From Swiss-Prot:
It comes from Lacticaseibacillus paracasei (strain ATCC 334 / BCRC 17002 / CCUG 31169 / CIP 107868 / KCTC 3260 / NRRL B-441). The modification 3-methylthioaspartic acid is found at D102. One of its GO terms (molecular function) is rRNA binding. The gene is rpsL. With S4 and S5 plays an important role in translational accuracy. Keywords: Methylation, Ribonucleoprotein, Ribosomal protein, RNA-binding, rRNA-binding, tRNA-binding. Residues 1-22 have a biased composition (Polar residues). The keyword Electron transport does not apply. The lineage of its organism: Bacteria, Bacillati, Bacillota, Bacilli, Lactobacillales. Part of the 30S ribosomal subunit. Contacts proteins S8 and S17. May interact with IF1 in the 30S initiation complex. Pfam families: Ribosom_S12_S23. CDD domains: Ribosomal_S12 (cd03368). GO terms for cellular component: small ribosomal subunit. This is Small ribosomal subunit protein uS12. Gene3D superfamilies: Nucleic acid-binding proteins (2.40.50.140).
Length: 138
């Protein structure tokens, strides 16, 4: 417990929180060639690499991911959710925040059904998260 004198001299330090998805906090000023403070909920980018990686122990799978160069020129690794995808190099994608716990370094998700990313085919439940249209009634 600090004394009153210590509090007068130094004061309380406010806790600063670190962003979970830092690349979404910046824009790019092409005239000045510098990053600007321009936070956004999603950002557009171009896939520079599409592949699979294996998760940390104790899980085992081949998780699909894409390396994406964002519109602010920051390059990030993003997870491709759902079963099957149509992404390849130079596909234009929309990313949102949200990490994948068992993939180190993956802090972003690709939004299915937006831009060049197709929705998941044959998805009946939780469709909005995977960009799947409502199936036609017979």
């Amino acid at each position: 417990m600090p004394t009153i004198n210590q509090l007068v001299r130094q004061g309380r330090k406010s806790i600063s929180t670190k962003s979970d998805s830092p690349a979404l906090n910046f824009g790019y000023n092409s005239k000045k060639k510098s990053l600007t403070n321009n936070p956004a909920p999603q950002k557009r980018g171009v896939a520079t690499r599409v592949g699979t990686m294996t998760p940390k122990k104790p899980n085992s799978a081949l998780r699909k991911y894409a390396r994406v160069r964002l519109s602010n020129l920051i390059e990030v690794t993003a997870y491709i959710p759902g079963i099957g995808h149509n992404l390849q190099e130079h596909s234009v994608v929309l990313i949102r925040g949200g990490r994948v716990k068992d993939l180190p370094g993956v802090r972003y998700h690709i939004v299915r059904g937006a831009l060049d990313t197709a929705g998941v085919d044959g998805r009946m439940q939780g469709r909005s998260k995977y960009g799947a249209k409502r199936p036609k009634k017979k």
